[in-house]
Amino acid sequence: MYGHAAGIGSAISKIQAEACFNTGIVAGESGAKGLFHTQDTSSVKNSYNSGTVTVADASKSAYQIAYGSNFTVESSYYNSDPGTAEPGVDSGVTGKTTAEMKTDAFADLLNEVLATSTTEVDGIKLADYAWVRADSTNGGYPYTQVREFLSWADVAKIQTEARLRLTGVS
């Protein structure tokens, strides 16, 4: 444990995250956040934290999702089982039990938002991905993978994007 800990990341500058998750333990000495900690205006959308979040100093903050100046959260979820930390934000976040998070219904709920995403980075569209879940993968929690496609043209497009990512060509 050291200082402030975050399940995915911590930054002084702006964070914009979508379709992220943390299932691991996050433990800090003077603060802990399940997904992100930042000092700037930031946002998290369609994400979840199912991991345990703890802080050594009981007078310090431990939050399931995020904390920061002007942090906006949309359509995100945290583990609400007894004994877990508070979400850390007032709106845009919903508690779900471990049992609820390990269901196909939870993956479907996440997909309702992901399917309409307009986020695109380096030609890669988040809407081309889907939340899926299997008992034997990721501890039974949802994770993202490329959607199933009905045409070979769509498959070729995704393969080209993957090849560009591997080679660093943009």
Predicted regions and their residues:
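Predominantly extracellular beta-rich ligand-binding scaffolds that present long acidic/polar faces
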Residues: 1-170
